[in-house]
C-alpha cells in the first residue's frame, strides 16, 4: 500500500504529494509516441449553460437540451482535461520524455493565452474552472515529482505553466471560500481539492492551509449518521452525490497526511462515517431511499471512474475484503479529475 513518501512536519518543509506521485515509471521502453492535438486555449468568459437548467431546487433532473449545450460550450476545456490526463497516464507507464514535453508545450500555450482566467459569469463557469484546475494540477504533479525529472527539459515553460496554475488557484479560492453553509456542497469540496493539488505543485502553504480549512468545513457538515444534508436535497441523486462529494475529500486527506497533517479525525471521524454510509449504499441503496423518501439512481456504482476514490480510501485505512473485491474487479480505476490512474498511484504493486 502506497501512502506517504516524505513528511513535511514544519512550516519550512516543501510540500509533497503521496508516494505514488513520486514513483519511477512502470517501465522504460522506447515506445513510439505522437503528441495529440491540443484544443485551442479557451479565453472567453466562463459563462455556461447548466445541464440542470429548468430543474427545481433539487437540481436532480437533467435537461437534455441544456446538457447538450453545456457539453458543446465546454468542449475545449474537457478535451484539454482528457488529453492531459491520457498523456500523463502514458508517461507513468513508459517514462517517455516526449510525453512530458507534449504536456508542457500544450499547457504552455494555454498559459501564455491566459486561458480560463476570464470572469466566471455563473456557477457553472466557476465549476468548470475548478474542475479543470483539479485535472491539470493533479496530472502535472506526476511530472513534477517523477524521479526522472522530465520537466527539467523545458524549465522556463514549466515555470510559466505553474505560474498560470497558481493564478487559477487564486481565482478558485476567491470564488469558493467563505460561502454560506447552506451553499457549501460537493462543488466546494472539489474546489478544495483543486486548491490542494495546486498547493503541492507550487509549494504554496497558503493554498495548502486554505484547502484544509475548506476540508474542515466539509467534515463538519457530515451528520451523526454519515449523511451530508446538502446532498440529501438532490432527491433521486442523493446517493450519487454523496459518492461524488467524498472523492475530493479523500484526496485532500491523503495529501494532508503526506505533509504531516492528519484530518481524518475531524468532527469525530466524519470522513469514516461518510465513507461507511456510502459503502453501505453500494450494498443496498435503500438506506438513501429511506432517508430521502425517493428511490435512488445507483447506476453509477457500476462505473469504474465513480468508485476510483476507493483506491485512495484504502490507502488511508485498511479496507475489508468486500471493498477490496469490488475494487479489484474493476481495476485499473481511473478518474481524470483526481489524477488519472489511481490504481497506479495508490494501490499495492
What residue ranges belong to the model's regions?
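Extracellular glycan-targeting catalytic surfaces
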Residues: 12-181, 189, 255-258, 263-349
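Long, repeat-rich segments with strong aromatic
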Residues: 202, 206-289
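Extended amphipathic alpha-helical interaction segments
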Residues: 161-192, 198-205, 213-222
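Catalytic-loop motifs flanking and including active-site residues across diverse enzymes
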Residues: 79, 132, 187, 191, ...
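Sec-dependent signal peptide recognition
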Residues: 1-3
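N-terminal signal peptide c-region/cleavage motif recognized by signal peptidases
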Residues: 6-11
Amino acid at each position: 500500500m502506497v501512502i506517504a513518501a516524505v513528511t513535511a512536519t514544519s512550516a519550512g518543509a516543501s510540500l509533497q504529494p503521496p508516494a505514488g506521485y513520486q514513483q519511477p515509471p512502470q517501465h522504460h521502453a522506447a515506445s513510439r509516441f505522437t503528441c495529440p492535438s491540443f484544443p485551442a486555449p479557451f479565453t472567453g468568459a466562463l459563462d455556461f449553460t447548466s445541464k440542470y437548467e429548468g430543474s427545481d431546487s433539487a437540481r436532480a433532473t437533467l435537461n437534455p437540451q441544456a446538457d447538450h449545450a453545456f457539453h458543446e460550450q465546454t468542449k475545449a476545456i474537457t478535451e484539454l482535461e482528457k488529453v492531459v490526463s491520457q498523456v500523463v497516464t502514458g508517461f507513468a507507464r513508459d517514462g517517455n520524455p516526449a510525453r512530458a514535453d507534449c504536456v508542457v508545450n500544450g499547457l504552455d500555450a494555454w498559459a501564455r493565452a491566459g486561458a480560463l482566467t476570464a470572469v466566471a459569469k455563473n456557477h457553472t463557469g466557476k465549476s468548470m474552472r475548478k474542475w479543470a484546475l483539479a485535472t491539470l494540477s493533479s496530472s502535472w504533479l506526476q511530472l513534477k515529482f517523477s524521479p526522472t525529472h522530465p520537466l527539467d527539459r523545458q524549465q522556463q515553460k514549466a515555470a510559466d505553466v505553474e505560474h498560470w496554475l497558481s493564478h487559477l488557484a487564486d481565482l478558485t479560492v476567491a470564488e469558493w471560500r467563505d460561502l454560506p453553509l447552506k451553499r457549501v456542497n460537493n462543488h466546494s469540496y472539489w474546489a478544495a481539492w483543486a486548491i490542494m493539488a495546486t498547493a503541492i505543485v507550487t509549494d504554496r502553504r497558503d493554498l495548502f492551509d486554505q484547502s484544509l480549512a475548506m476540508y474542515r468545513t466539509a467534515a463538519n457538515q457530515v451528520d451523526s449518521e454519515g449523511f451530508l444534508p446538502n446532498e440529501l436535497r438532490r432527491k433521486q441523486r442523493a446517493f450519487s452525490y454523496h459518492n461524488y462529494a467524498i472523492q475530493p475529500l479523500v484526496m485532500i486527506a491523503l495529501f494532508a497526511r503526506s505533509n504531516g497533517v492528519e484530518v481524518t479525525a475531524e468532527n469525530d471521524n466524519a470522513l469514516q462515517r461518510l465513507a461507511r454510509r456510502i459503502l453501505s449504499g453500494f450494498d443496498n441503496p435503500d438506506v438513501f431511499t429511506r432517508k430521502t423518501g425517493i428511490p435512488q439512481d445507483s447506476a453509477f456504482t457500476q462505473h469504474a471512474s465513480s468508485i476510483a476514490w476507493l483506491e485512495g480510501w484504502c490507502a488511508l485505512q485498511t479496507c475489508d475484503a468486500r471493498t477490496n473485491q469490488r475494487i479489484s474487479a474493476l481495476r485499473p480505476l481511473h478518474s481524470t479529475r483526481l489524477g488519472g490512474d489511481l490504481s497506479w498511484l495508490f494501490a499495492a504493486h
